[in-house]
Every structure is written in structure tokens, then in C-alpha cells.
């Protein structure tokens, strides 16, 4: 019973959590995370946000296997956005419900912005 309550609270935290740069519903949030991870991998060679996300997703699968389909759907949009970010260098804009038109490069200015996005999203997973 206690594990079920903890799992439910964890799932709510993951799905409902809305960091500063994460906009909209859970699908929007996962799309944004996928895009940010794609860009951090391109510019920094790291995937810290992905590791943190997958640890929490793994806990949800373990604690609440009945949430498997929901998590699968969220991970699908995450990976879709990750691939778009790596190939087109854009991220999802939840407000506009579309990928942004401005592309990111790995200039210092863009790296600072990408790092800021990553930090905000990581804070939302804590």
C-alpha cells in the first residue's frame, strides 16, 4: 500500500511538474526534454537530463507497471523530439504547439541558453 502511494506521488511529480521552460501538458514537456537532450548531446556531448529522466521513468515502471502504456507514449514523443533536435537543431515550443523556427548552433550564446534549459528541466525532475 505504501509503495503504491509513493509510486502515485512520484508519477504525479514527473507528469505534472512544470519547470520554468517546460510548457503545456506532459506530452509537451517530454517533447521539450527530448529536444534539449538532443541539443546538449550535439553541443556538450552529454545526456545528463536523459539519465535523470530515465531513472525516474524506471521507478515508475517498477512501482506502477499499470502506467506502462502512458509512459511508453510519453517516451515515444521524447525520442521523436530528440531526433528532430539532432537533425534540425530545433526544440518544441509548447505554447505554439510546433518546433521553433530559429535553429540552435553550438555558439557560446546558444550553449548558454541550452545549458539553462537543461538546468531548468533537471530542477523539475528533482
Where are these regions (language model features)?
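Compact alpha-helical subdomains of small soluble proteins
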Residues: 53-126
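Extracellular/secretory pathway and lumenal proteins
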Residues: 16, 47, 110-111
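N-terminal signal peptide c-region/cleavage motif recognized by signal peptidases
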Residues: 12, 17-19
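Secretory pathway export signals and precursors
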Residues: 8, 39, 101-102
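Positively charged n-region of N-terminal signal peptides that target proteins for export
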Residues: 1-4
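Immediate post-signal-peptide N-terminus of mature secreted/exported proteins
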Residues: 22-54
Amino acid at each position: 500500500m505504501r509503495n503504491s502511494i509513493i509510486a502515485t506521488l512520484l508519477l504525479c511529480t514527473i507528469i505534472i511538474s512544470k519547470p520554468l521552460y517546460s510548457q503545456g501538458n506532459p506530452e509537451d514537456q517530454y517533447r521539450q526534454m527530448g529536444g534539449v537532450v538532443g541539443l546538449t548531446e550535439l553541443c556538450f556531448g552529454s545526456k545528463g537530463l536523459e539519465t535523470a529522466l530515465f531513472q525516474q521513468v524506471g521507478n515508475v515502471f517498477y512501482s506502477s507497471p499499470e502506467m506502462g502504456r502512458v509512459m511508453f507514449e510519453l517516451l515515444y514523443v521524447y525520442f521523436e523530439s530528440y531526433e528532430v533536435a539532432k537533425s534540425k537543431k530545433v526544440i518544441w515550443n509548447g505554447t505554439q504547439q510546433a518546433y521553433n523556427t530559429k535553429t540552435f548552433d553550438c555558439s557560446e550564446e546558444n550553449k548558454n541558453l541550452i545549458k539553462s534549459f537543461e538546468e531548468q528541466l533537471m530542477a523539475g525532475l528533482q
